[in-house]
Amino acid sequence: DPTMSRGLGDVYKRQVEEAYEVADAIERENWEDLKNELGDLLLQTVYHTQIAEEENLFNFNDVINQISEKMIQRHPHVFGEENRNKSASQQIKDWETIKAKERAQKNQTGVLDDVAINLPALVRSLKLQKRAARVGFDWPDILQVLEKIDEETRELVEAKQHLSQEKINEEFGDLLFSIVNLGRHLGVDSEEALKKTNRKFTERFRFIEDSISSRGLKLEETPLEEMEDLWQISKKALSN
């Protein structure tokens, strides 16, 4: 198999794709698709492990043993008799202590060191902010977060006026990061909120497409004003 002859770095993207397809099947509540996608994800796990074994890195038993040890270590309130009566707040403190020990074992001394770089950007932003907030680096109230968004918006407008694409990209990223922070203070997961909005946009745009095509017309030949009218109709038609 040519896939097996490639290095681990060549196939990890496929693993990520399969994980997203698993998540998609779960959100659609399509259990037949979920069964198939879990199989595809498992296949990628086996692929990675086989490649690692051929390169004398580790084998499947090592993987199983590692996750078993991690589960026991991370959940003493489940696997340890003496820890089962601890309060939720104490369990959280214990969790932070355990994670700190794990980071130390990996020579990760920084609070943010083990936040995976390849996470989706919105997900990683939220994790970074939560991790920083745990050690007190956080705005005390939402008003200051809103003021920060205003500041970043002004800086983005200024960058646009100077026609510096590099600066525009930087300031736009800062604005997005601040919006994720606002969501965190409101108890909103930005990734999930945006996914919901994407689905809503898709449904409404399909309504426009179907309405126009049912009259034998083409989208690109339809005036913007008419598409906007259909958009407003779709909001009411799809609200139930």
Regions inferred by a protein language model and the residue ranges of each:
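Charged mid-protein connector segments
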Residues: 54-123
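C-terminal domain-closing interface element
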Residues: 89-106, 220-240
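Single conserved hydrophobic/aromatic residue that forms the stacking wall/gate
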Residues: 1-12
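An amphipathic alpha-helical micro-motif enriched in hydrophobic residues
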Residues: 15-23, 31-53, 61-68, 145-159, ...
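Charged, well-structured binding/catalytic surfaces in domain cores that contact anionic ligands
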Residues: 110-158
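A short, structured beta-strand-centered segment in the mid-to-C-terminal lobe
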Residues: 215-219
